[in-house]
């Protein structure tokens, strides 16, 4: 099982009547004492005005058992906005025919299912997904997976895609994350909500957004930024911040390098990390997830920064510079930005890790939803399968599979060896008549042919791998672009393009 994510508010007593608030979310890696909550008369109640028992700055609440007391509740007061990302050039060729959030994940899912499921599990049922590139498969998936009137007619829930469009007032496409939201502000402001929840469509994590929003309200923030500890190797790829003892962001630097990077080092024991982990992770990085009060969003994008295109590099630092209350919400659970082929590969193979996977799809309390496909159970005939995840509807015959993820409808023939590989599967089954027709033409069916060996690779959907093929990168090539031949190599990982044909006997 994955780490159980908990969250709450650290309260530190002050000599004045006000109190300091440090918002946070923790995994089992954080430790501390409970923050007790009681009703006004001292007795526990289901709905209440909560009083906090003040503890030391290092204390962390065990909010696994704590209540979230949002009033009004999230289904009525929060609008979820998921940013579909840009062209996804670093994930190419997986984004050749699909938007980044539509990339398959974990055998049965797509990336977009992660933020949408987090929203639904957090009682947020009004969700827009903004996209600009290759949105056909994303539209299709969302319409099939998440029906209209999500959450019942009372809540009037929905998951809708908003594609970039031109208008007489604005002939330009989306210029960045903030510009994408600005172009649809006219639609977002029609919703009678208190906050906008801004999310990314290409992250893998599990978070209770209700606790995130509650922390935003309790700290009386204009903007709350989800943040997590980060090591120096990856820090240059993120926006980094410094916070004061109240959890307020006092300095923000987008993707700093050199001396600017060194200047952003902080003592992350304030997040609840022990000394050893704090030394390994001396930075606080933005996760690209924000809660922004509605009136603040309208003011920032229309009046204060009408030319700003990006939240991370322009709007958030700008809001800090003009004195707005920008708070940090500290998170220490599993989180992965799936922006590159290597990160995508590692995130998928991470679900096979034992004894505890990096991310679990088996969490009963926070399930990940997806499109119901009504496929039959997978069939394994004399197969040797170790440390792997197998999707629905697969047919696997007398082969060996080790430390791999096998996507839905995958067909793997006799004698094949699959190691350290992600197979995305297929969109449809081929009939025996189809296979005879292909054989007569000298082609091969969808799936993995007899006696083929695939190691450390990603095989996209509907790929046709012939017999006796070896995809093992024996020369350890790190980068190669062979699109006409049906594959790319990035970071040493061979990626077979969607619908590609790899003839029998090929060695890659």
Curated annotation (Swiss-Prot):
Residues 1-27 are annotated as: Disordered. One of its GO terms (biological process) is glycogen biosynthetic process. Pfam families: LbH_GLGC, NTP_transferase. Residues 1-59 form a transit peptide. Seeds. Residues 15-27 have a biased composition (Low complexity). Its EC number is 2.7.7.27. SUPFAM superfamilies: Nucleotide-diphospho-sugar transferases, Trimeric LpxA-like enzymes. Activated by 3'phosphoglycerate, inhibited by orthophosphate. Allosteric regulation. InterPro entries: ADP-Glc_PPase (IPR011831), ADP_Glu_pyroP_CS (IPR005836), NTP_transferase_dom (IPR005835), Nucleotide-diphossugar_trans (IPR029044), Trimer_LpxA-like_sf (IPR011004). It comes from the Eukaryota. Pathway: Glycan biosynthesis; starch biosynthesis. It is found in: Plastid, Chloroplast. Keywords: Allosteric enzyme, ATP-binding, Chloroplast, Nucleotide-binding, Nucleotidyltransferase, Plastid, Starch biosynthesis, Transferase, Transit peptide. One of its GO terms (molecular function) is ATP binding. It catalyses: alpha-D-glucose 1-phosphate + ATP + H(+) = ADP-alpha-D-glucose + diphosphate. GO terms for cellular component: chloroplast. This protein plays a role in synthesis of starch. It catalyzes the synthesis of the activated glycosyl donor, ADP-glucose from Glc-1-P and ATP. NCBIfam families: glgC, PRK02862.1. Belongs to the bacterial/plant glucose-1-phosphate adenylyltransferase family. Heterotetramer. This is Glucose-1-phosphate adenylyltransferase small subunit 1, chloroplastic.
